[in-house]
Amino acid sequence: MLIYDSWNNDYKSPFGAVKRDESIRFTIKLSKDTKLDFAPVLVVFRTGFKERFLSMTQIDETDDCYVYSTIFSAKYSGVHYYYFSYTSNGTRFFIKKKDGHIGHINEGDLFQLTVHSNHYETPDFLKGGIMYQIFPDRFCKSGKLHQNIPSGRVIRDDWGGVPYYKPDENGHVWNNDYFGGDLEGIRSKLGYLSDLGVTCIYLNPIFESHENHRYNTADYMKVDPLLGTNEDFKKLCEDAKEYGISIILDGVFSHTGADSVYFNKFSRYDSIGAYNSKESPYYPWYTFYNYPNEYEAWWGIDTLPNVVETNPDYTKFICGDGGVLDYWIEQGAAGFRLDVADELPDQFLEDLNKCVKKHGKEKIVIGEVWEDASNKESYGVKRRYLLGHQLDSVMNYPFREAIISYIKGGNPNDFVLPVMTILENYPKPTIDVLMNFVSTHDIERAINHFGGENCDGKSKDWMAGRKLTEEQYAKGKNMLKSAFALMFFIAGVPSIYYGDEAGMQGYKDPFNRVCYMWGDEDNELIEFTRELGKIRKSSSAFKQGEMRFIYTDNDIMGFIRHGEDEDMLVFVNRSEHNRNIDSFLSMINDYSISVALRGLITDTGLNISAYDYAVVKCIK
């Protein structure tokens, strides 16, 4: 007998996170053999607060069980935890979570209930859209001659070459080789991106910095000269808008570069930096242990001195009127992806959110969080990312891990459980704009992960320039197609890492950041990606539709997205064999019209090709 299931509306309604003051019905079933001393109770609490006990009332009975229920609403936003308790023959019993969502007696963990602000809204422009991530130096080189290039840079003339990675005699990797990709190059490819269905471009850092990754900001108010000018960025945003594409910038606000206007360790700038004098206006932004050479730095990397985000002058510089955020949004940015969000204090995130949102609810804030962001703890603090006052969305690493694991042959439940856990823990406004991906600049490209050798523990010499064999590439490509199908149709927004759609390869940083191989693309894979985009945009169900799993076996993952006027049934085949789902016809009995947008409906079921997917539009 099923005692409780937090994923089942018969036991908890509504499913998942709720608004503050929203009523939730909890229901449990207890065997008639259980002799209760008094009515069972629901116990709810927030960390650091007292437990709240709610008596449950019997509302029904069956041949073998009694059904108890109660209604709860939370007065405060925050992550709540709950369990059920009852006493029988003087002994107290607990019903807790096991197997991710099932109630068990006297074993398991607490259930989670996320309660968010009842004013929490996220931008509509990203819902139902497609994101495309670009590492600016490596996407497209316009050939435009740029002025005022800072000293110390190695300008490469071998587009597509292996990035420099070897340390010097002192063990330092300079990251100072540049291939010349620029904003004008990106602008020239807007038509290509539009054809892919892209509605949002996420740019890795573009501000002046003296390493090619540009995560060591030198000047927050200036586009790096090798990428172009501030006016070039404004023009890119204007032209992108004509294609229905928005631009999101990478905001690196937990640290600056040591070689910067603000720290100025190498006296490159005319400013008096924090390193130059304790009288510098920037000195309070940093934490020095033994001035000037010993200071707090991100992960101890001395080229990345940490800032004190709560310093009023720094907060004002970033979030104040006329500050960094205001300036770039006024130039055309649709929002920011926040690097290392775990390093940013709650108050700073709330100030940042307020600043971005004063430009309108369509501006977005996305955080880099690698774990479940609803219950994340960093530096001993329970974070409040998704309660309505900090982040709209996060980079969805849990989904990425689930997709990769499943496509490589993992147990179907190892995909279903993490996906459903996120859907249960995250607010619906967050889910609608979740950034879903299989590759980024911080991890190896998915095609390598699927088709290549395991690179964990391998040296950079081993990774450098290493290409997949034809057999490895074919395997990786097939698995990537199945992964893309999951990424495009599960809840949230698919994010393509530049070149993945064209078969680009690369193991770990910096080899996952090589130049886009224009003229040598895998056009069949590009067309496959275009088709995914067209189907995704064909139905509002993929925009904000609730998601539920409806079919799993060792090779097929099936789920439904519920729309207002139609439902979309999606089935992804991860195997090398064509498959037929015999039970499919019974799934569509209640629909008046069922049309296969991909796949083939026959008298015996639904046919799906190897490493492919099927999408069926169903209308009641």
List each language-model region with its residue ranges:
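Substrate-binding/active-site clefts of carbohydrate-active enzymes
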Residues: 135-200, 206-331, 352-358
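C-terminal beta-strand-rich structural cap/linker in extracellular carbohydrate-active enzymes
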Residues: 32, 603-620
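Conserved, mostly hydrophobic/aromatic
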Residues: 28, 134, 193, 203, ...
